[in-house]
Structure formats: C-alpha cells, structure tokens
Design a protein with these regions (language model features):
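Hydrophobic h-region of N-terminal signal peptides that target proteins for export
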Residues: 7-15
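Flexible loop residues that form catalytic
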Residues: 30, 107, 179
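Sec-dependent signal peptide recognition
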Residues: 1-7
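Glycine-rich ThDP/TPP pyrophosphate-binding loop and its adjacent helix/strand module
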Residues: 192
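Histidine-rich, glycine-flanked metal-binding segment
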Residues: 17-18, 27-73
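Glycine-rich, proline-tolerant flexible connector loops at the mouths of alpha/beta enzymes
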Residues: 110-111, 176-188
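Divalent-metal coordination cores built from histidine and acidic residues
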Residues: 65-70, 74-75, 79, 86-176, ...
Length: 204
C-alpha cells in the first residue's frame, strides 16, 4: 500500500506543467499588432500563457515552431458546407488552410431546421466550428414554393416566423441571394421585413 501511495504521489509531483508547449513561434495575435517571438502554452484545451515561458517548464508535447507563424484560427465567413460537413466532419481541407471556423447558409440558402441540423452535427465529431445564417431563399421556398410574385402580408409574416425560429435555434443572421430563384421574385420590403426579424435577435 505504501508503494502504491508513493507511485500516486510521484505521478502528481512530476506531472507536466502543460499539455502542449509551443516554443519560439512568430505569434500574430489577430488584433493588428506586429508579430512577436513568443512561446504559447496550452492546458485542458485552453491557451493559458503567451510570452517567454521559463525553460524549465514541462509539457506532454513540445513543439519547436522556430521560423513558423502561429496565429488564431482563421474564420471563413462564406462557405456552403451544409452537405459536405456531414460527409467530411473532420474538415481537414479547412484545417490545412488554418481555418477553424466556417459560416454557412450564405447566398440565401441554408438548412431550414437549424436546431435539428446542429444536433446532428454535434453527434458526428466536427473538427471545426460551424455557424450558420438563415437563408431568404430557403424560408421563401418553404412558404411560397417558386412562385413568381410578391409575397402577401400573411406570407411575409410566415417567413418572419421561420426567421425568428432559426435565430432562436442559433442562426447568426440572415442571408440573401436575390439573383437566385425564388428570392429573385421578392421586393425590397420583403427583404427588409425578414432582415428586421434577424436583427431583433442581434443577427447580422
């Protein structure tokens, strides 16, 4: 029992300071500052230190990033990954370009039921962060099909309800694609009304 207690204590005493320690990187912080030479320490999946970290510091994994750039993950704000992200959830194509967050639902086309879609994505093990806009063409098609006419007040109200639901389900804003069917048949008043529904939730 004493031997077991000693082993447990020893493991605690000699545990690494960090999970990952990146040394000598050219750090660009994304705030517009000039790059700086620095070390970056990560523990429990969080950055816990940036700067000159003592040489005696230990880590489970040490990376020498000399002459390499270390920056926050890039955000690709214009993607159409609705189908692809389910087939390729690790998204290595984005990660190899330094992209760690994508925004989809652009050009007026998105998933209609974002709550169900987000739940599905949560189960597949995503390699990147995914956010979505709610698409004008999507909600118009749900209410009016491909009708080549202006929406009635009642139809606009139904579309507003869909936008409102999407925003409550986690949409980041509202997108349009007015050169595509059926959005091409809408007028300015319709677009403004739906944009206001998104804006009421702080959406873009």
């Amino acid at each position: 029992m004493r031997s077991l207690a000693f082993l447990i204590c020893s493991a605690t005493l000699f545990a690494a300071d960090y999970d990952v320690l990146i040394r000598h990187a050219r750090v660009i912080d994304g705030a517009g500052n000039p790059w700086m030479r620095a070390d970056v320490a990560i523990k429990d999946a969080r950055i816990v230190a940036v700067g000159r970290i003592p040489a005696a510091a230990t880590a489970t994994r040490v990376i020498d990033a000399r002459e390499r750039v270390l920056a926050p993950g890039f955000i690709d704000v214009h993607t159409h990954v609705e189908d692809d992200i389910e087939k390729n959830p690790r998204a290595g194509n984005f990660l190899l370009d330094g992209v760690t967050t994508v925004i989809t639902g652009n050009c007026g086309s998105s998933e209609l039921n974002l709550s169900a879609w987000f739940d599905k994505l949560a189960k597949v093990g995503l390699g990147i962060n995914v956010g979505s806009l709610v698409g004008h063409n999507t909600v118009r098609r749900e209410v009016m099909g491909a009708a080549d006419r202006q929406a009635t007040p009642a139809e606009i109200a139904r579309m507003q309800a869909l936008v409102d639901r999407a925003m409550r389900d986690g949409a980041m804003g509202f997108s349009t694609g007015l050169e595509y069917v059926p959005g091409i048949y809408s007028n300015t008043d319709e677009v403004i009304a739906l944009a206001k529904s998104a804006a009421a939730h702080g959406g873009v």
